[in-house]
Amino acid sequence: MKRLRVPCSLFCPYRQMRKILVLLSFFTVLAATAQDIPPRKQQKLSRWHIPPANYSGITWLGEDRYAVVSDKDSLDGWYEFRIQLDPAKGRVKQAERLAFHGMHTGAPVRDAEGIAYSPERNTLFIAAESDQRVLEFSDSGQLTGRELQLPAKLSLDSIYGNYGLESLTYNSHTHTFWTVTEHSLKADGEKSTARNKVPCKLRLLAFGDDLKLKGEYHYETDVPQARKENSRYAFGVSALTALDDGSLLVLEREFYVARKFMSSWVRCKIYRVFPAAQETPLKKEFMYSFTTNLNLTRRNLANYEGMCLGPVLDDGSRALLLLSDSQGGFGNSTYHLRDYIRVLRLSGF
């Protein structure tokens, strides 16, 4: 009779357990890496009776105060928000939209997309798409006459339609402003679409407290993932957040709107880059991603355009707030977009 050779591992509990422990350790390391920014469910702003708007940028003013811009307002300025976080759970406990601070600056709609707070001067800077400028405002919402000295290559003629300045952030430790266009400049490459599958080639621009350009770094997005062409489509970088160590968090956002709205989706990815490394393009460190949808089973579609740091939470992590743009509650008889806020945790920063 031929003797069957049975693997020893089936009868060696110690050896088998050791293999299992090694595998578990490996996957634990992977999980820890992927969860540097643990997921948190998004919350509707309407639960606190905050009216829908076109919220496109957010910055922290300290404690529970934030400044938020809306890109369809006739006045140029920002809304003051009070957002109270649960320091243990990292969720929003209470939110309130307070006064609007702003003024007429000449344009019917300046299309404010990004906002940053400078605590040293107690002023706010607002980046707008309609004029491709970043203007400084006092804390009462009046122009100071100062602005970031953007290079001529970022002029209105250099951008694709509705793909101009989108992001703005400032870090008081590095004394640096950062801004970037949502999409490639015309001179830097063709428009990224679902058909050509090319990445956006972007220029991350750094400015000092003197508002002068002090650095330019090349950043490439992932390629579009949409499979179909559609006129209602947005792809590129929608927000930046500058960290104390000189690195940047970059929010890549792809928004696909189906022809009859059902089956629309938004995919967001957060990467970290280190401009000081001087790579071309900058090497990206993946941090976190999520997708929201409008379909038969999920109706949480959210177009995230704002991102900023918040306070330190009880576990020592730092709150990272994301804010979505509902296009003023855009929709039809069966569904309307909602404004959402999402809080993530940054650990080890």
PLM ranges: what are they?
Residues 1-38:
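Bacterial Sec-dependent N-terminal signal peptides
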Residues 35-349:
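Sequence/structural signature of beta-propeller domains
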